[in-house]
Amino acid sequence: MPPAARRLAVGPCKKAAGVAAAVVLLTGCGGGGTAEQAAPSSGPAPGTVTTAPDGVQEVTLQTQDDYVFTPDAFTVAPGEVRLTVVNAARQTTHNFRFTPGDGPEAIQPEIPLLAPGERRTIEFTVTVPGAYGFECSFHTQLGQFGTMTVSG
């Protein structure tokens, strides 16, 4: 076989091997799904309401790239609440606010921006029992909302 014909015959194989090697290399560099997610906390599961030593109720919500809060519902007693939102998404920025007009009383604190990998905490006081809607206002139409119930 003449050298030019051999180059044509071998060229596509070398290209395919090179592409396959690049894919394997890049896949190895990309890491697994858990390495890119926010590190799990050693505290209670998301949505579990606990009472801190200072008497404030604490709850953590988590969100990812799937446009939901985990959990999307939790219950607290009237009083002070410390709410942490963890954005475990790889790509999506979220926010958190209590839906204006969706509850017995207004809750003002909000988290305007929460980039992937960030966690932010707000504190507020609720005195009136009832259901309070919350949302990511960027993704409400995609179903990213939930309910905090104040019971007691």
Protein language model regions, located:
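Surface-exposed loop/edge segments in extracytoplasmic proteins
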Residues: 104-111
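N-terminal edge beta-strand
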Residues: 51-81
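Beta-strand cores of secreted/periplasmic/IMS beta-sandwich domains, seen most often
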Residues: 72-92, 120-128, 132
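Sec-dependent bacterial lipoprotein signal peptides
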Residues: 1-27
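Low-complexity, Pro/Thr/Ser/Glu-rich flexible segments characteristic
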Residues: 35-58
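Beta-strand signatures of extracellular beta-sandwich domains
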Residues: 95-99
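Extracellular/periplasmic metallocenter environments
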Residues: 27, 31-33, 46, 53, ...
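Solvent-exposed coil/turn segments that connect beta secondary-structure elements
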Residues: 64-66, 88-90, 101-102, 127-129, ...
